[in-house]
């Protein structure tokens, strides 16, 4: 037996030992614990608004913290800020690169950010004295595409990239202050914890990781998916998170139990998941799929409670407002829909 084979076997044994140790701590399943709970019943949501204006596939959207404005990014090379109440466009920002994959709204509402195949995170100031929107900072440094970005505040932003790393940036200086390394595949998505002290990432190595923003260390790793993880989203409590993968499943992982609690899948669903988000209470998990639909799952019992159907192409992104009153879905059909 070659030395490499021996090392592979040792690694496999260690992996099994870790899994056994995790299982030993698992004294009950979520299905058992929630068996006495009522199911949420059928969830029926209607499209209340359709936001028309993009001329090509929409790749990303993010709600502002006022639960009214949202930003969307499209292959047409535009970043649009929408008023979801009136469907008016507040700003249409032409981008230097039309190959945009992510966008983010700052908590203050003063800035939006975007990035993609240009490997750069571009920050735009919405509140300039002149009234026009302009690039206030460009953050180059990643050696792969930018897959996701989220503001901590007006001065800091976290990015994930196809170069297998995530990074914390000081926007003022334009420098990476922390680099988060540990994934062995493209990092596709990140989600900030409610207390903004940690974040979780999902990657093409089929694993998700919990990172400490303060010291840059990976605190926990979670496996179980058998294909790329495209989306991650923290549970509102901050003690769990959901993932969506190309293996056609969503999974719920618990940080304190250090393991997977629940799998969300259906025999009829054989396509990948592009995006996931929880309702404000955490009882519902919404997931966008390649088959043009968005499924609504009972997050605690694991059953499918509804489907949001209406897009004519892949649902590429979705988000729930901070006040929990509406869901937005964005699609390759070039439209955004607001549901409740």
Swiss-Prot record:
The modification N-acetylserine is found at residue 2. Guanine nucleotide-binding proteins (G proteins) are involved as a modulator or transducer in various transmembrane signaling systems. The beta and gamma chains are required for the GTPase activity, for replacement of GDP by GTP, and for G protein-effector interaction. This is Guanine nucleotide-binding protein subunit beta-4. The modification Phosphohistidine is found at residue 266. G proteins are composed of 3 units, alpha, beta and gamma. The gene is Gnb4. Keywords: Acetylation, Phosphoprotein, Repeat, Transducer, WD repeat. One of its GO terms (biological process) is G protein-coupled receptor signaling pathway. Disulfide bonds: none annotated. The modification Phosphoserine is found at residue 2. GO terms for molecular function: GTPase activity; protein-containing complex binding. One of its GO terms (cellular component) is myelin sheath. It comes from Mus musculus (Mouse). It comes from the Eukaryota. Belongs to the WD repeat G protein beta family. Pfam families: WD40_Gbeta. WD repeats lie at residues 53-92, 95-134, 141-179, 182-221, 224-263, 268-307, 310-339.
């Amino acid at each position: 037996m070659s030395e490499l084979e021996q090392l592979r076997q040792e690694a496999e044994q260690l992996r099994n030992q870790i899994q056994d140790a995790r299982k030993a701590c698992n004294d009950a399943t979520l299905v058992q614990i929630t068996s006495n709970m009522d199911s949420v019943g059928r969830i029926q949501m209607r499209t209340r608004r359709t936001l028309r204006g993009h001329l090509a596939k929409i790749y990303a959207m993010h709600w502002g913290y006022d639960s009214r404005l949202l930003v969307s990014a499209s292959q047409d090379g535009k970043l649009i800020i929408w008023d979801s109440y009136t469907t008016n466009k507040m700003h249409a920002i032409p981008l230097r690169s039309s190959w945009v994959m992510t966008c983010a709204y700052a908590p203050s509402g003063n800035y939006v950010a975007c990035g993609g195949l240009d490997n750069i995170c571009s920050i735009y100031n919405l509140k300039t004295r002149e009234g026009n929107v302009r690039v206030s900072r460009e953050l180059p440094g990643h050696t792969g595409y930018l897959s996701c970005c989220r503001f901590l505040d007006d001065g800091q932003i976290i990015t994930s990239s196809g170069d297998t790393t995530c990074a914390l940036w000081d926007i003022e200086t334009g420098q990476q202050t922390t680099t988060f390394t540990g994934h062995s595949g493209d990092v596709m998505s990140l989600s900030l914890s409610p207390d903004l002290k940690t974040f979780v990432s999902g990657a093409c190595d089929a694993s998700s990781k919990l990172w400490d923003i303060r010291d840059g260390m990976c605190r926990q790793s979670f496996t179980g998916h058998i294909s790329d993880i495209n989306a991650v989203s923290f549970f509102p409590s901050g003690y769990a998170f959901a993932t969506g993968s190309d293996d056609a499943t969503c999974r719920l992982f618990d940080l304190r139990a250090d393991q997977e609690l629940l799998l969300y899948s259906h025999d009829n669903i054989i396509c990948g998941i592009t995006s996931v988000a929880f309702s404000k209470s955490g009882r519902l998990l919404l997931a966008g799929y390649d088959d043009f639909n968005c499924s609504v799952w009972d997050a605690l019992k694991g059953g499918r409670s509804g489907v949001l159907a209406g897009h004519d192409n892949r649902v590429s992104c979705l988000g729930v407002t901070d006040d929990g009153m509406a869901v937005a879905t964005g699609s390759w059909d070039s439209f955004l829909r607001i549901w409740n």
